[in-house]
């Protein structure tokens, strides 16, 4: 049985949410609409996954039920924004989300229907936030009152609304990860063929890594994909354990005569101690709150003095993207130098060099050379 949520969540307007990491004071009002659209794209991907209608336990909503709630949240906040813009100091009718879930039978709704409904509701409210992004202070300070007396301005309502969406995406983060794996699964061969050529930047990192590991060194490769980098490392005299979280990539490598393991660095046994870990352009799919643990686990599987070669996309926040050789959306986490350095140090890595670069499509990257402390 689902336990009703009776908490007053207005504190998230002033404090960082310890569960999902949402920081309302840092939200740029001009970006709320785009974030809501990105959130909706994620729910479409989640609802397409097998098992999305199943509850992980009797007391927790299924991804489908969360999606129904997010759809209705977007509709409700559209309604409340219009009230605040059209009336002076309106009072919102009480909305019991748990009663709504039961009355509407969220558990029996069709994901193929809920997804488009959620996307439509998201676009409607996102467009409204877009229109308000550059509104004057008088408009942004218009007030509305919840039935319990809690007061919101147009500005604070948007920040409060966004937390609800971010938090529930966090609630189904396992399905978010599955959706990204499924995207690669669907286009594994196309991705391998389209990314097979090494560029000069990657060659330079491979050369450094091979020198740091030493001849004959044992390497754990995370995210081997089609096996391009593993071959390059072997050509440089290293022994490589090929791994990937995507089943289709593992099958591709095995079909080419290589041993390869299906492995999730967040949860699976890593073996070791290895002389080095190569993780090029793969840990960018790891959720922000999970990367410190992954880095710690990789350090634990590496001998002292062993090397880490890693590259991540540079930027802020997270987002879904459909680009390149993979047709379905994938979830990316973007990093800045300072928090990345802190995560590496806390995990037991000493940064030897951290450089910033720009890829062929204009994407900024952070490339890290580190050594196990």
Task: Report residues per predicted region.
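Terminal targeting/low-complexity segments that flank the catalytic cores of oxidoreductases
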Residues: 1-38
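A glycine-rich, hydrophobic loop/mini-helix early in the fold
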Residues: 34-61
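Acidic/histidine-rich alpha-helical segments that form the ligand environment
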Residues: 38-39, 43-47, 100-142, 161
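Short, contiguous alpha-helical
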Residues: 1-14, 51-101, 123, 130, ...
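Short catalytic micro-motifs in class I SAM-dependent methyltransferases
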Residues: 281-285
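Class I (Rossmann-like) S-adenosyl-L-methionine-dependent methyltransferase catalytic domain
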Residues: 177-220, 225-272, 289-293, 297-300, ...
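A conserved beta-strand element that flanks and buttresses the S-adenosyl-L-methionine
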Residues: 278
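Conserved acidic residues
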Residues: 275
């Amino acid at each position: 049985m689902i336990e009703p949520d009776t908490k007053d969540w207005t504190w998230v307007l002033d404090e960082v949410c310890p569960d999902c990491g949402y920081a309302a004071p840092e939200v740029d009002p001009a970006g709320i609409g785009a974030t809501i659209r990105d959130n909706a794209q994620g729910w479409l991907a989640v609802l397409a996954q097998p098992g999305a209608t199943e509850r992980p336990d009797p007391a927790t909503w299924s991804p489908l039920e969360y999606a129904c709630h997010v759809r209705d949240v977007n509709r409700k906040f559209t309604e409340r924004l219009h009230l605040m813009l059209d009336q002076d100091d309106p009072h919102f009718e009480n909305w019991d989300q748990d009663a709504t879930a039961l009355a509407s039978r969220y558990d029996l709704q069709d994901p193929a229907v809920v997804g488009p409904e959620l996307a439509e509701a998201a676009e409607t409210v996102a467009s409204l936030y877009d229109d308000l992004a550059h509104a004057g202070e008088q408009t942004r300070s218009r007030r509305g009152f919840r039935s319990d007396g809690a007061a919101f301005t147009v500005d604070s309502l948007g920040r409060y609304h966004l937390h609800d969406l971010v938090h529930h995406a966090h609630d189904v983060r396992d399905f978010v990860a599955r959706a990204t794996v499924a995207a690669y699964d669907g286009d594994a061969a196309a991705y391998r063929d389209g990314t097979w050529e090494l560029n000069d930047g990657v060659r330079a990192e491979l050369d450094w890594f091979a020198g740091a590991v030493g001849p004959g060194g044992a390497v754990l490769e995370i995210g081997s994909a089609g096996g391009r980098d593993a071959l390059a490392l072997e050509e440089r005299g290293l022994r490589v354990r090929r791994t990937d979280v995507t089943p289709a990539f593992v099958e591709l490598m095995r079909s080419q005569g290589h041993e390869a393991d299906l492995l999730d660095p967040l949860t699976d046994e890593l073996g070791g101690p290895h002389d080095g870990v190569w993780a090029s352009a793969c840990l960018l799919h790891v959720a922000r709150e999970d990367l410190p643990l992954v880095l710690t686990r990789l350090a634990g599987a590496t001998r002292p003095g062993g090397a880490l070669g890693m590259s991540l996309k540079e930027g802020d926040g997270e987002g879904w993207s459909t680009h390149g050789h993979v047709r379905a959306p994938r979830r990316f986490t973007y990093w800045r130098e300072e928090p990345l350095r802190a995560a590496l140090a806390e995990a037991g890595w000493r940064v030897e060099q951290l450089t910033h670069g720009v890829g062929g499509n204009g994407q900024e990257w952070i490339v890290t050379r580190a050594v196990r402390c």
